[in-house]
Design a protein with these regions (language model features):
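Short consensus segments that form the blades of beta-propeller domains
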Residues: 29-33, 40, 72-74, 97-104, ...
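Hydrophobic core segments of beta-strands in well-ordered, beta-rich domains
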Residues: 9-13, 43, 50-54, 91-101, ...
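Structural motif
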Residues: 16-25, 58-62, 102-114, 162-170
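Structural signature of eukaryotic scaffold interfaces centered on beta-propeller domains
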Residues: 1-4, 33-48, 73-92, 133-153
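Beta-strand initiation motifs
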Residues: 4-6, 19-26, 66-68, 116-130, ...
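Active-site-surrounding "flap" and adjacent substrate/cofactor-binding loops of secreted or lumenal enzymes
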Residues: 27-28, 49-82
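Beta-strand-rich domains and repeat architectures in extracellular enzymes and scaffolds
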Residues: 1-53
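Asp-box/WD-like beta-propeller blade repeats and closely related beta-sheet repeat scaffolds
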Residues: 101-155, 159-160, 184-185
Length: 186
């Protein structure tokens, strides 16, 4: 069970959570999140909670909605409403990628969190709800992040709605890259 690091703390469901910092799972009851499906949580490399989201609101480590942290365009009923990644080679910048529900009009978007803001509690910057897909490119509720073979950069991967098309974006130290399309998976 030992899992100290960015995935040490999980918040989900109805005010529920688990921490793995002690070596065994321990229930947490201090969260502010209430959601039926998708969530994302991120901690620092020492296992200290940074923030968590249901794809709509972002709570800081004190379980208070962070500055500019309301109004993300994910959907709490989306099976994967959000994922959080750390910007490669940055100690303080994180990206939240959100996914709308069932081919909804808000599609796949990203927002930037700067942990140096708001006294170290973090804030969403002006890069909030930036669209990755046009409304004509409806996405499913699926989104994931995969480490690049260079062991530094990442790929964000989504699947189009009712289609075999997968779309990928690279994330490297310069930010979020151009769209790449993979298709015909069968």
């Amino acid at each position: 069970y030992t899992q100290v690091g960015p995935n040490s703390n999980w918040y989900f469901g109805n005010l529920a959570g688990i921490t793995f910092n002690s070596g065994s799972p321990v229930a947490l009851t201090n969260g502010a999140l209430t959601t039926t499906e998708g969530v994302a949580t991120i901690s620092d490399n020492s296992g200290n909670l940074l923030f968590y989201t249901n794809g709509i609101n972002v709570w800081n480590r004190n379980h208070v909605i962070m500055t500019n942290g309301a109004g993300l365009l994910g959907d709490q009923s989306s099976t994967q409403s959000a994922i959080i990644i750390q910007k490669p080679l940055s100690n303080n910048i994180y990206y939240i990628f959100t996914s709308d529900n069932d081919a909804g009009p808000d599609g796949i978007r990203w927002s930037e969190v700067d942990m140096t803001l708001s006294g170290g509690f973090g804030a969403i910057t002006s890069n909030k709800n930036v669209a990755l897909l046009s409304q004509a490119q409806l996405s499913s509720e699926k989104i994931c992040a995969v480490r690049n073979c260079n062991n530094q950069d990442l790929w964000i991967i989504t699947k189009d709605w009712n289609s075999s098309v997968f779309r990928c974006w690279s994330v490297d130290p310069s930010g979020i890259g151009n769209i790449q399309t993979w298709s015909a998976t069968g």
